Amino acid sequence: MENLVITLYDLHNLRLAYNSERSYHAGMGYLLLEGGAEFGGRMRDPDLKAIELAGGFNAPIRIIPTAAAPDNNHQRAGNNGIHWFQSLGAKDVISVSLLSKIRADDKNIAQSLRNAKLIYLLGGFTHYLGQTLKDSLAWEAAVDAYRNGAVIAGSSAGAMVMCEFYFDPSAGRVHEGLNLIPHTLVLPHHNTFGKGWAPKLIKKIPDVTLLGIDEQTGMIDDGEDNMWNVYGAGEVTLYQNGDVTVYQPGNEFSI
């Protein structure tokens, strides 16, 4: 890309069935960043963990398909998300019709997100997603849900806008994100094209931690003292203070 201007599954089911009868995590919630190629294959582990942290299979899951709206792919992408989470056992999954800045200020959509326990931002057009959600009632509601224990998750563009900064490859520019994770920028699809962004971004924003996340891989801040854990098929690569560190599934780290 040139534009730089008892199985583990059974154990999860047992834990989720138990957690569905309990209240969700009190206080600040959890964040899940995924590197792309969501809704299939080896993404089962991070997504099941997110459902567990959200309170179990009965937890309300709300999918935000905004990033797929510019090329009219939002309905297909949203339906893929619904089918995926239902295949994992989730009972209450809806793709919200948040496709524009006007819809981002719709009070009914905002209330649906405020009541959610897992909010999932799909991939697609990064800058469109960031600009649509920025300073909106919908995003304010999502943050309220997070402060009350919900999980906010994002894949590819969805993960990118969750950080303080994101890179828009179509314009070759760095923009301010939604800042759930300060001093960071996600490099999605790191094992395919995302790693190619790293050299110039390190020069452009040297004080920002770059989070290179492979496809079919997620990182969740579910460890003690908000430590991050790696789930899924690939690796997470941290570019921080001039160092490059690679973490495997099962590894724990801080940012």
Labelled PLM ranges:
Residues 4, 11-14:
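Short hydrophobic targeting helices and cationic amphipathic motifs
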Residues 18-57, 67-79, 83-87, 168, ...:
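C-terminal and late-domain segments of enzyme folds
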Residues 28, 56-61, 116, 149:
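A general structural motif
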Residues 33, 94-95, 120-121, 152-155, ...:
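General beta-strand structural signal in soluble alpha/beta enzymes
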Residues 61, 119, 156, 186, ...:
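A residue-level signal for conserved active-site and pocket-lining positions in enzyme catalytic cores
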Residues 68-123, 128:
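Portal/gating segments that form or line small-molecule/metal binding sites
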Residues 122, 128-195:
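Class I SAM-dependent methyltransferase SAM-binding "motif I" and its flanking Rossmann-like core
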